[in-house]
Swiss-Prot record:
HAMAP family associated with the record: DNA_ligase_A
Transmembrane segments: none
Residues where NAD(+) binds: 34-38, 83-84, 114, 137, 171, 287, 311
Enzyme class: ligase
Residues noted as binding Zn(2+) in the record, renumbered to the chain: 405, 408, 424, 429
Reactions that this protein is recorded to catalyse: NAD(+) + (deoxyribonucleotide)n-3'-hydroxyl + 5'-phospho-(deoxyribonucleotide)m = (deoxyribonucleotide)n+m + AMP + beta-nicotinamide D-nucleotide
Role noted for this protein: DNA ligase that catalyzes the formation of phosphodiester linkages between 5'-phosphoryl and 3'-hydroxyl groups in double-stranded DNA using NAD as a coenzyme and as the energy source for the reaction. It is essential for DNA replication and repair of damaged DNA.
GO MF annotations in UniProt: DNA binding; DNA ligase (NAD+) activity; metal ion binding
The name this protein goes by in its record: DNA ligase
Name of the gene: ligA
Similarity annotation: Belongs to the NAD-dependent DNA ligase family. LigA subfamily.
Amino acid sequence: MDKKKFKEEIEKLREEIEYHNYRYYVLADPVISDEEYDKLLKKLIELEKKYPEFYSPTSPTQKVGGKVLDGFKKVMHSIPMLSLDNTYNEEEIKEFDERIKKLLGVNEVEYVCELKIDGISVALRYENGQFVTALSRGDGIEGEDISENVKKIKSIPLRLFKNLTIEVRGEIFMPVKEFEKYNKIAEEEGLQPFANPRNATAGTIRQLDSSIVAKRNLDSFIYYVVNPEIYGLKTQWEALKFLKEIGFKTNPYSRLCHDVNCVIDFWKEMTKKRTQLDYWIDGLVIKVNNFEYQRKLGETAKAPRWAIAFKFPSIKAESKILNIELNVGRTGVITPVAVLEPINLEGSIVKRASLHNFDYIKEKDIRIGDHVYVEKAGGIIPQIVSVIKEKRTGKELEIEIPKSCPICGGKVGKISEEEVAIRCLNPHCPQKLKRHMEIFVSKSAFNISGLGEKIVEKIVDARLINDVADIFYLTPFDLAQISGLGQKSIANILEQIEKAKNTPLYRVIIGLGIPLVGEKTAKILADKFKSIKALSQASYDELTSIEGIGPEVAKNIIEYFKNEKTKEIIRKLENAGVKLEQEEDTKKSSKLAGLTFVITGKFNSFTREEVKEIIEKLGGKVTNTVSSKTDYLLVGEKPGSKYQKALELGVKIINEDEFKKMIID
């Protein structure tokens, strides 16, 4: 194949991946599995490395990996990014409507209501359909060039579906689930957690290392076209449809309202629904729909006259701190938790709120007995936002940093000067072991069924194990000491433990509990190093040269394997007969090669994860959605909607016994 054909193949792959990015991140309607997508991306990465002359700054591969920047240069906006006037009540919205109609000299005005996403505003510029720059709002006159970081946001296209030269604007945000995930890791690792998703977004988008941005899974909604008349657009509603057509993600909740009463009804509706969303919103943005009307109304120096923010009432309530509990996590981080007088906050009873760390307590001057305002960060996570100091009586107690671990009584301290967390420094702390064991035996790791949270706690409390590797040395006599376990349960647990010795390498890596190493990273490491021994000997440079492994992850891997306790755990796993190497691809059968499966329901002989691994090991593919390209729907007990879809499309349906016959014959 000559270079011209390779160039054509690269272009074709880019277009295909961009299409799947759009289906997944914009439409939320993927048509291929994650595995298929990863294969396409991997192939493109390999071809671009082999033929660097075909490099493109807008290739989908620019969304993985990262660059380290010196800083962010300031750039003037093409037109100012203005702020909005705002209101919190219905009467002022009605006054806004009357003012608009009076200025325009009309009796009726249509409005577009958009969710006011609490994130970071961004201006995106494209030339001939190619991404050029991304600017933050800054002071509204000039912003910072955040292009390298914005390239890592999967919902923002690097190439449009049309070859347009255009500037659009929107909001970058961190979904609540990503915010929760980051803060959980931050607290475990002794890092300062973010107060809310908006701060998390701002802190992420200004990272000098764009590989960190890629890992934090920011998202976007685009809502504004600069100079819309160039593209024949006459209304904001048309502009939103146009933005989606050319490849941008727009918010599905936007609503066209024919009068102000519709606006108020929608505001009331979203006031109730806002806590059900996976992103933080603090109100609606009400815009005059007609662009000609917008031009007539104009702007003040601060804000457009044709738009207003209709804010939601604050989700907060008053409570009192009754006590402080100290929780110990997997890495020993001690997290203070406020025990509160129960309060009803947005329909749920709140009795506790995390205080994150002792620096946070000092900064907010929080004391036992204080009356405080409690708010739901992102509409979900209870947190104390302020102390009502005027209600202090003088009987409040200052919260002291513990001098010893609340669980084991061991020494506490910081493992580095930079971190804010206080940790239990005892390597044998039972609470640390309990939290690690929960990960170790989980489905995503060694998948040892029968060892639920309560049984794990009893095993640790009975001192039957000193570390996670000891699970492979348990005997029937050991387990007989655990209340609630009969002979049948003991036999089942021991059978599952024996079976777990052949766990795939990537799941072994997950089970080790290396900070910041999840399933995707574990698979990358397993494919690259093939064994725990090779991974444990990897250098920082070797790790950071791997696509998808950033500096933070590399540092954690090296620190983890340098630890003497880790070395002991690895030795014990090896001596117990746990497989610490990856099977070579040559062992793969091609029995199911070229066949695509979808799985639904529950199985007697396998877990769904095991079924997936069997199919892939035999050369088949597993996807999440039934389509005309699906060869088989494998059905267990209580199948879901996929069963009906397969019937409609005429996809062959097989049960567990038929599947067993297929893989054995």
